[in-house]
């Protein structure tokens, strides 16, 4: 008779409309993910407050020996991921591995992944526009007497949303390796989710925005629509999607296009890095392949 599918996600680390199951379900409904439109139920995997988790071994884990994953996700017999592939201000791009690793982590699991470093403000670059404070869900950003942003590290969750919100590169990670550490931990969390059961993965490489989908102020797409990719191997899938984006022509009136048009811009010949220069997107793929989750080699079959 087939399986009984359900749609799922875990609560976010930062406050907002997905910080608990009740508001999360309302958010899902407002975005069209509801039984009346999809034909299946929606379950928030880590429960009402994001504490319903399972500690799962990470196969060959180097940075995380165990992962804290939403219980409903680990209770499922089969795992299918559906990902919107886009740019990302901390990880370079948000693909299948990020969707699984960060998306399936409980709130505590997300905190572990983000723990390498909290953002800081280079006040000489701050324009006092207050955009970062509006984006911060933790009320961690205030302004001093000179109207320069100040981050309260006791309130900061380390989610990095303020980095993407700043148009003037005034906010950066305190730890030089923080983004790379985040990438590698995400890969290991994704491996914990997928290990030991059938999995299949689909990526929609469309509306390729420069930053994470959690940004309400996200900018115009940086690249034209490319298509829909699918694979049993999430590592090969992310590599194929990334390669397709690297070979695409940047859209002129986008964050990427405008960066490339700046006089004296230090071009990286990398559409992700030229959109968000302080990222190291290859680390996720390297780590996932290293611990045996999949391979970066692929054969592209067009249909």
Predicted segments, located by residue:
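Extended, low-polarity segments enriched in aliphatic/aromatic residues
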Residues: 1-303
């Amino acid at each position: 008779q087939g399986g009984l599918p359900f749609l799922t996600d875990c609560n976010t680390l930062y406050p907002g409309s997905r910080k608990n199951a009740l508001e999360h379900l309302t958010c899902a409904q407002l975005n069209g993910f509801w039984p009346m439109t999809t034909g299946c139920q929606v379950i928030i995997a880590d429960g009402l407050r994001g504490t319903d988790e399972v500690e799962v071994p990470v196969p060959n884990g180097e940075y995380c020996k165990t992962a804290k994953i939403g219980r409903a996700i680990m209770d499922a017999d089969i795992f299918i991921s559906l990902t919107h592939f886009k740019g990302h201000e901390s990880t370079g791009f948000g693909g299948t591995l990020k969707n699984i690793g960060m998306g399936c982590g409980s709130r505590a699991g997300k905190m572990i992944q983000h723990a390498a470093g909290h953002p800081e403000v280079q006040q000489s670059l701050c324009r006092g526009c207050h955009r970062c404070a509006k984006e911060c869900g933790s009320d961690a950003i205030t302004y001093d007497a000179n109207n320069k942003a100040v981050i309260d590290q006791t309130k900061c969750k380390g989610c990095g949303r303020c980095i993407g919100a700043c148009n003037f590169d005034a906010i950066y990670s305190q730890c030089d390796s923080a983004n790379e550490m985040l990438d590698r931990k995400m890969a290991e969390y994704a491996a914990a989710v997928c290990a030991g059961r059938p999995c299949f993965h689909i990526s929609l490489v469309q509306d390729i925005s420069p930053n994470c989908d959690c940004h309400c102020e996200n900018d115009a797409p940086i690249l034209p629509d490319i298509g829909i990719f699918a694979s049993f191997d999430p590592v090969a899938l992310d590599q194929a999607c990334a390669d397709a984006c690297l070979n695409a022509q940047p859209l002129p009136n986008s964050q990427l296009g405008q960066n490339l048009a700046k006089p004296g811009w230090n071009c990286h010949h990398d559409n992700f890095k030229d959109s968000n220069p302080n990222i190291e997107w290859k680390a996720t793929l390297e780590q996932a392949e290293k611990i045996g989750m999949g391979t970066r080699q692929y054969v592209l079959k067009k249909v």
